[in-house]
């Protein structure tokens, strides 16, 4: 087989791998998406719970941004359960790690317990602002939100490293989340799918709450 043949074989394999990954992501996304009955439960039975806190602290840190973005995030994080605790140790409605909550609580004078709904929502929205402010390059508001939520889930440093990967390999400009997420598997491995689905789910829940 000549050089041209090897090149075509390589490109063909790369295409098939890309197709398989896209198909796998679609399956995972469908499997992780709640059923219509679960959606009705989340968006009807829990509509009023903690809404005042989401409104208050969204207004404090994000002005006129729709507060339901953070409620959607909390649905994804904890299903709006104030006593939720993940296997990794994240706690409360906004699933903050102990160190993150402790640092923010010390800065803004919150109670030491992360399971207090008001304090946890306050700290979570405050942490979102830190994640948002990390991204200073000019982008649309929607793109900034996606990067904010991705940073909240995976850490801003990991998202920056993913951006560096796609820029170094000339995948794309690295300005849009749809581009940056292509580099995330090179940074966080199998956990990259969790972050990609996380952003999708927050947007999905927000669309259900509107």
Per-range role (PLM):
Residues 2-37, 41-48, 102-103, 107-126, ...:
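Non-catalytic cell-wall polysaccharide-engagement segments
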Residues 46, 50-61, 69, 84-85:
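Peri-catalytic and regulatory segments of divalent metal-dependent proteins
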Residues 49, 65-70, 75, 88-91, ...:
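Extracytoplasmic
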Residues 58-67, 137, 141:
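Short, charged helix-capping/linker segments at alpha-helix termini
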Residues 71-75, 95-98, 150, 200, ...:
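Generic alpha-helical structural context detector
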Residues 78, 90-91, 98-100, 115, ...:
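Acidic/His-rich structured neighborhood in mature extracellular/periplasmic domains
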Residues 84-104, 167-171:
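Short, surface-exposed glycine/acidic/tryptophan-bearing loops
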């Amino acid at each position: 087989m000549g050089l041209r043949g090897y090149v075509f074989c390589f490109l063909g394999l790369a295409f098939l791998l890309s197709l398989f990954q896209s198909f796998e992501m679609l399956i995972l996304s469908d499997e992780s998406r709640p059923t219509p009955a679960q959606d009705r439960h989340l968006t009807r039975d829990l509509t009023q719970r903690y809404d005042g806190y989401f409104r208050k602290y969204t207004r404090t840190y994000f002005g006129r941004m729709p507060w339901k973005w953070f409620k959607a995030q909390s649905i994804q994080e904890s299903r709006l359960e104030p006593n939720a605790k993940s296997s990794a140790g994240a706690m409360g409605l906004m699933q903050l790690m102990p160190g993150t909550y402790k640092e923010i609580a010390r800065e803004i004078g919150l109670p030491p317990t992360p399971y207090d709904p008001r304090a946890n929502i306050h700290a979570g929205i405050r942490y979102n602002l830190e994640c948002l402010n990390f991204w200073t390059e000019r982008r649309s508001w929607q793109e900034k939100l996606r990067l904010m939520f991705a940073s909240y889930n995976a850490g801003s440093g990991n998202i920056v490293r993913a951006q560096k990967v796609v820029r170094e390999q000339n995948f794309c400009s690295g300005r849009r989340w749809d581009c940056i997420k292509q580099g995330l598997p090179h940074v966080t491995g199998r956990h990259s799918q969790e972050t990609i689905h996380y952003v999708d789910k927050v947007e999905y829940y927000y669309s259900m709450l509107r």
